[in-house]
Amino acid sequence: MIDTTRSLDDLSPARVTTAFDLPGHTTVRSLGVAQGIIVRSRSIVGSFGAALQTIFGGNITLYTSLCEKAREHAFEKMLADARKVGANAIVAMRYDSTEIGSGVTEVICYGTAVIVEPA
């Protein structure tokens, strides 16, 4: 459920959208790109456990958990970046990831930091 009690001075996860505008609000100022980057690696133990899971097929829960945590941390870093410039919303939010080495993955969360007002 969206928290509608928060002040428009606050940037809450409820004011982050993949759309190009925030429903019920008007964008009054664009503050530029906000981003959060996290680089994660698999541990030897985790890699071994995941290798065992691949034998049986299906969801590899160790990697799923690692990916979820990396996205969550990147999202939180993006929120912090947007707060630094005074944003109260983020539009056009996206995730991207790249393997930058053996077992090392970069996850980036980015969007446009904006100031919105009720429409």
UniProtKB/Swiss-Prot annotation:
InterPro entries: UPF0145_dom_sf (IPR035439), UPF0145_YbjQ-like (IPR002765). It comes from the Bacteria. HAMAP family: UPF0145. Belongs to the UPF0145 family. PANTHER family: UPF0145 PROTEIN SCO3412, UPF0145 PROTEIN YBJQ. This is UPF0145 protein Bcep18194_B0595.
